[in-house]
Amino acid sequence: MKKYIALLISLFISIMGIAQPLSTPLDYLTAMNKAHQTLNYEQLYLFQKGDDVTSLRYRHAYYNGHEYAQLLHLDAIREEMILRENVVGYFGDYQPFSLKTPYILDDFPTVVYSDFSQLDGYAFLDNGKMRVADRIARVIRIVPRDDFRYQYMLWIDEENYLLLQSHLLDRDNNVLEQFRTIQSVVGDQLLYIVEPIRTLILPTLLQTKIHSELKPLEWQLKWVPRGFKQVASGQQNLSEMLAQDGQIESRLYSDGLFSFTVYLLQNKGISFQDQFWREGKTSVYSQTIGDKDVIIVGEIPLASARHIVQEIEFSSQGEKQ
C-alpha cells in the first residue's frame, strides 16, 4: 500500500512539474520576452526596413544572470554590435564607440523587449499556427484600439517561444518593417561566445549630452495617442550637435511598444509646412509654428504627428503665434 501511495505521489509531482501549455496571446508574448533574454540561441535572419533588406546573424547567451550577444551584418562591409552587461559596442567602417543600453536595438525587432502586461489600448489576438523556418509558430497580432498607432503580427516558436517572424504594419496593412528568421538554433553550445565577449575591450563609452531641464519648458503636449507617457525631457545646445548657436528642447514619449520625441528649436528663416518622411517604422514630421520649428521623430503614423503638433500649447511667456 505504501508503495502504491508513493507511486501516486511521484506521478502527481511529475505531472505538476510539466510546464503547463500557454493558453492566451499574452502568455505567448510574455514567454517570448523571457525567451529572448534568457535562452542561449543563434538566429540567421533577414531584416527589411522599407526597401532596404539586410541579412544578419544574432547570437545570444545568458550566463550568471548576465546577457551577452553579438549582432553581425553578413553582407557588404563588416559591421557588428557586441552586448556585454548593459553596454553595447559598435564596430564597423567608422570610429568604434559604445552606448549604455541593455539591448541591441539596431536591425532587430525591439518588440521582443516590451512589457506586454503594461500596454494600454491594444488587443492581443490569436491567429492560429503557421510553419516558419521549418518550425511551428503561433501567430499573434497586436492591434491598437485606435488609428493613431501601428500594429504588429508576430510568429512565435511553439517550442522555445523565440520570435521567428514579425511584420510591423500601418493602418492600411502595409509592411513597414519585417523580420524573418531563416535558421534558429537553441542550445548551451552558444555559451562559447561568453568568454571572448567578457575579455573584449569595448570602445569608449559615449555619454549623452541632453541635459535635464535647466528651467521648465515653456510648452507642452495637450494630446498624445492613448497609452503614451512622457519618460524624459531636456535641453541641448545646438553647438554640441551642429555648428550653430541656439538651443533645442525635447520631450520623449513611449507607450511601452513604440516611442517618439518632439523637438522644439528656433526657426532659422526656412518655414516647414507639413513635411513628412518615413523609413521603415521611423517617421519624421516637421512644422513651423510662429518662430519655432517643431520636429517629431519616432514610430507613429502621420495622422498622429499632425494631431500632436496641432495640440501643442505654449505658456504665455513662450507663446508662438
Predicted feature descriptions by range:
Residues 2, 15-66, 76, 129, ...:
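N-terminal leader/targeting segments and the immediate start of mature chains
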Residues 6-15:
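Bacterial N-terminal signal peptides
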Residues 38-42, 65-70, 134-141, 162-165, ...:
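Short, hydrophobic/aromatic-rich segments at coil-to-beta transitions
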Residues 53-57, 148-152, 164, 176-178, ...:
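Short, surface-exposed coil-to-beta transition loops
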Residues 55-109, 168-180:
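An acidic-aromatic
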Residues 103-152:
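Intrinsically disordered, low-complexity linker/loop segments enriched in Gly/Pro
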Residues 133-199:
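Gly/Pro-enriched, hydrophobic low-complexity segments
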Residues 201-289, 303:
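Short, solvent-exposed recognition patches
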